[in-house]
Amino acid sequence: MEIGIYTFGETRVDPLTGRQQGAEERVAHLLEEIEVADRVGLDVFGIGEHHRPDFAVSAPAVVLAAAAARTKNIRLTSAVTVLSSSDPVRVFQDFATLDLISGGRAEIMAGRGSFTESFPLFGQDLDAYDEIFSEKLELLLQLRESYRSWQEYIC
């Protein structure tokens, strides 16, 4: 059995002061949380992707790359990468790079997303929700299974 933690990186309100936590502060605390999770021996830490002002993380791969530099063993995953409003090639490349930085500890958890605010931001048609996700997931899986060497294209 594996044990891990995931977060959406939501910013919090201090119950004593009523002060809203800023994104910079939340991400700093998030990186500290990942370090502690690694030290105590948890197996995986996941960060969700959101494109709303009440969440601090819109690019999980970037935050996970910072965490990779500060940890040794814990696997690092998105929870989830909103594939419906993302370019699957870019997602694959970002996480392949994270996998290199982390020494093979990166994972992608792809999903549709539970909030639909990101669709108009990225020019997606909400009426094609299911078709968009299916097509992009198929491409992401093809990228994972296909070895590409660009060496033959170097002049």
Where are these regions (language model features)?
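N-terminal beta1-alpha1-beta2 module of alpha/beta enzyme domains
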Residues: 1-75
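Structural detector of well-ordered beta-strand residues that form the stable sheet scaffold
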Residues: 4, 77, 107-109
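Active-site beta-loop-alpha junctions enriched in small/polar residues
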Residues: 8-10, 50-52, 81-83, 111-115
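Internal, glycine-rich beta/alpha segment that forms the wall or movable "lid"
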Residues: 16, 87-155
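Active-site oxyanion-binding pockets that recognize sulfate/phosphate
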Residues: 19-20, 27, 81, 123-126
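Short, surface-exposed linear patches
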Residues: 24-29, 66-70, 85, 98-100, ...
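Glycine-rich "substrate-gating" loop/helix at the edge of Rossmann-like oxidoreductase active sites
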Residues: 53-56, 81-87, 125-126
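Outer membrane beta-barrel
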Residues: 73-80, 91-95
